């Protein structure tokens, strides 16, 4: 696979994960609305609060990589702005390596958690009795995609090809 094809594949992965996150946000809205309607009409719909939580968690984890790649994560760049190019590059490599290592641990834990929940038939304690591996799988997928994004950023920084994206949002002082 050529580099350009790999870039397109990775960008598509981050983009589709963001689309999935958006769908889960809609799922959160639907679950909350269903719970509200159920309280007024007493329809007997069970577990809407739990499903809203599952959808919200899935949305958050699936959006992590896209957020990282678009420069939307919180960063302390005051030190980086003061450094010369070589020192800045070294600090960026160190920070990205540390973040990649943490993301790898997080992904490994998330995958193991979902697998163990599936293996031991773990279910939620709510009245919905959902097998926990189902919502945990979204977390595992999101953390694995985040790990891929950090490896991508690290490799780009080492090769000197990383383009730092910054948020278009204006700085806020409160």
What is the meaning of each model-derived region?
Residues 1-174:
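Alpha-helical transmembrane segments and membrane-interface helix-loop junctions
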């Amino acid at each position: 696979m050529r580099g350009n094809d790999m870039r397109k594949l990775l960008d598509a992965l981050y983009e589709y994960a963001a689309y999935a996150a958006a769908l889960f946000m809609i799922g959160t809205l639907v679950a909350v609305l269903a719970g509200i309607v159920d309280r007024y009409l007493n329809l007997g719909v069970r577990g809407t609060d739990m499903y809203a939580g599952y959808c919200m968690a899935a949305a958050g984890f699936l959006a992590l990589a896209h957020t990282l790649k678009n420069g939307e994560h919180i960063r302390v760049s005051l030190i980086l702005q003061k450094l010369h190019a070589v020192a800045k590059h070294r600090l960026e490599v160190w920070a990205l390596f540390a973040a990649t290592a943490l993301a790898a641990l997080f992904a490994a834990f998330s995958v193991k958690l979902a697998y163990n929940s599936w293996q031991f038939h773990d279910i939620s304690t709510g009245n919905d009795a959902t097998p926990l591996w189902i919502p945990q799988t979204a977390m595992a997928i999101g953390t694995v995609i985040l790990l891929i994004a950090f490896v991508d950023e690290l490799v780009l920084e080492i090769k000197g090809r990383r383009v730092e994206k910054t948020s278009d949002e204006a700085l806020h002082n409160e």
